[in-house]
């Protein structure tokens, strides 16, 4: 499903090329609007921001509740998507990361169920599974984020602007979340 005809045409070509026409059907659709509950046992949503993805999951709630697995790859705001996944009664079962064309990507797999332990804010933002797996690509991402926050904190510490103090507190909170996740790489070594 896609909202635009161009990407849908590309998908159709790939489906034909890989001889999957008997297994895959394409539809022009805004999110899951053209999908009926129970029609799909797996849902993949990728290549868009987390706000839009969260909204698609909410609008397609009935379809989501009838599926057995979702694979989600938000380009931004992964915390909003993870929170929505939990709100819908799914748990995150796996995470994968890659680095391509100068950008880090994370995808996560979800299945119906409740997390054994609730997520904290750091885990909503940065995930729980990749740091636990000590994923080397994701570690580089976290180190890059740590360096960005360190520079921002240094700049804000030197600033005399009234808004700098509030921004500094936010940057320090964000740094603590990053360090929490990086700490998982040091555990059990």
Residue ranges and their predicted role:
Residues 1-41:
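S-adenosyl-L-methionine
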Residues 33, 39, 51-189:
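Class I S-adenosyl-L-methionine
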Residues 47-48:
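Glycine-rich, N-terminal phosphate-binding loop of Rossmann-like dinucleotide-binding domains
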